[in-house]
């Protein structure tokens, strides 16, 4: 399984957790054993899910802050899952370049979101990296 597919699976798990309002990582273990998932990708999935769950309030606050005039309950569930994934990578997984996280989030948005989702996701993530000065650290 490639990193791209692992990222897609992680987004789906975050989506499911949100829909079920159940952010217990042990309950999603079954996803990690579907098909052939390499150990490296399992580690990535575990890391992202753990960071997303442990930092859910902080990540959601950032999403609300940068999605001007949009409350979380008005953001489409799939858009929220994509943003939670991207922010988990950008903020807590410094070994992944933020540009990769943004590009991959936009690709997921094109596949799973509405016509507006790619621009919405790009706008929020772009504003965040600009405001946080991440572009200066390249």
From Swiss-Prot:
GO biological process, one term: transcription antitermination
Protein name (database record): Transcription antitermination protein NusB
Record keywords, A-Z: RNA-binding, Transcription, Transcription antitermination, Transcription regulation
Lineage, opening ranks: Bacteria, Bacillati, Bacillota, Clostridia, Peptostreptococcales
Keyword RNA-binding appears in the UniProt entry: yes
InterPro entries per the UniProt record, alphabetical: NusB-like_sf, NusB_fam, NusB_RsmB_TIM44
PANTHER family: ANTITERMINATION NUSB DOMAIN-CONTAINING PROTEIN (PTHR11078:SF3), N UTILIZATION SUBSTANCE PROTEIN B-RELATED (PTHR11078)
GO molecular function, one term: RNA binding
Family statement drawn from the similarity comment of this UniProt entry: Belongs to the NusB family.
UniProt function note: Involved in transcription antitermination. Required for transcription of ribosomal RNA (rRNA) genes. Binds specifically to the boxA antiterminator sequence of the ribosomal RNA (rrn) operons.
Organism, as annotated: Alkaliphilus oremlandii (strain OhILAs) (Clostridium oremlandii (strain OhILAs))
Alphabetized Pfam families for the sequence: NusB
GO cellular component: cytosol
